[in-house]
Swiss-Prot record:
Listed GO biological process terms: 'de novo' IMP biosynthetic process; adenine biosynthetic process
Keyword Cytoplasm: yes
Membership in a protein family: Belongs to the AIR synthase family.
Lineage: Archaea, Methanobacteriati, Methanobacteriota, Thermococci, Thermococcales
Involved pathway(s): Purine metabolism; IMP biosynthesis via de novo pathway; 5-amino-1-(5-phospho-D-ribosyl)imidazole from N(2)-formyl-N(1)-(5-phospho-D-ribosyl)glycinamide: step 2/2
EC number(s) recorded for this UniProt protein: 6.3.3.1
Keywords: ATP-binding, Cytoplasm, Ligase, Nucleotide-binding, Purine biosynthesis
Name of the protein in question: Phosphoribosylformylglycinamidine cyclo-ligase
Gene: purM
Keyword Amino-acid biosynthesis belongs to the record: no
């Protein structure tokens, strides 16, 4: 059995260490108090800056150790999609329309072919998200970086009265899941350390090689969510990234009673190799890359809109009692 912490990513330890940076960052809010761009207190996935009738939403994220798989097989044309997806999917959680991004690419040494392939993914991701890449930084650091690191910072905009905070979520609301394309960009450290030493990247599983499963690009949910926001009163939005279903706690203090889809593909392979169910749901998206919370009255219309883009399904309901229960797998996070 291998857990995320044993693989080298101890989220509890990280959270404890991170509090020092968070505390320092919060103290800087006073530097913009009463000025244009004053930080708001209502963001969860993205920070919100006050710009009159609008909030400017801002977030930052990266591809993580997925780049190690790309490097191992010499295929870099999709990690740009991943980086953009990780950022824009966070922006839409507050109801913001993503508009622009700057990238950060840290490398040991320049390689034209790698740059060309990364650029293809960045362009494809930007097109899908409807954003402009307006700048960036390439850091060549042979003494510090042994490989590659790709990250970005994205901004979006939302009218103040249209921010999605989760405050409208009520017990009984419908919880809808939008399918993921696979592992996305979270849990790669655990997946790599568990599977690659045992099978190798060319191992075939369900007619696909392992590296293909691991490099499948993160799905971008901008188009379906923006259309949904125009048609239905959305109560809450959650990007299911690092932390798996625990991300739902970011949008409300109410609980969730869910029935998750069958464990298939890369998740089935990981589970078959000894990762317990609770750890699976704590680390991976488990086939659900994005969650939408709406009233029961709006459920059918929401499903109709979302299914025009990606397979979407009712997962369950919001409950009065806190905690997340995956009823069909007997998993509880209280």
């Amino acid at each position: 059995m291998l857990t995320y912490a044993q693989a080298g990513v101890d989220e509890e330890k990280t959270s404890k260490a991170l509090r020092f940076i968070i505390e320092a960052a919060r103290k800087t809010f006073e530097f913009r108090k009463g000025k244009l761009g004053e930080p708001g207190d209502i963001g969860h996935y993205s920070a919100l800056l006050d710009f009159g009738n609008y909030y400017l939403a801002i977030t930052t994220d990266g591809v993580g150790t997925k780049v190690l798989v790309a490097e191992a097989v010499g295929k870099f044309d999709t990690i740009g999609i991943d980086m953009i997806a990780m950022n824009v999917n966070d922006l839409i959680c507050v109801g913001a329309e993503p508009i622009a991004l700057v990238d950060y690419f840290a490398i040991k040494e320049p390689n034209e072919r790698v740059f060309e392939e990364v650029a293809k993914g960045l362009y494809k991701g930007a097109k899908e998200a409807g954003i402009a890449i307006v700048g960036g930084e390439t850091a060549v650091m042979p003494d510090l970086v042994n490989g590659y690191d790709l990250a970005g910072t994205a901004i979006g905009i939302v009218e103040k009265d249209k921010v999605i905070t989760g405050e409208k979520i009520r017990p009984g609301d419908a919880v809808i899941g939008i399918s993921s394309s696979g592992i996305h960009s979270n849990g790669l450290t655990l997946a790599r350390k568990l599977l690659i030493p045992k099978y190798g990247l060319d191992y075939e599983y369900e007619s696909r090689k392992l590296w293909e499963w691991l490099l499948e690009p993160t799905r971008i949910y901008v188009k379906p969510i923006l259309e949904l926001l125009k048609s239905v009163e959305v109560h809450g939005l959650a990007h299911i990234t690092g932390g798996g279903l625990l991300n739902l706690k970011r949008i409300t203090n109410y609980g969730f009673r869910l029935n998750m889809p069958p464990i298939n593909g890369i998740f089935k392979l990981i589970h078959e190799n000894g990762v317990p169910l609770e750890e699976m749901f704590r680390v991976f998206n488990m086939g659900v890359g994005f969650v939408v919370v709406v009233s029961q009255e709006d459920k059918e219309e929401a499903l109709q809109i979302l299914n025009r883009y990606y397979e979407s399904f009712e997962l369950g309901t919001v409950s009065e009692r806190p905690g997340i229960i995956v009823e069909n797998y007997g998993v509880k996070f209280i």
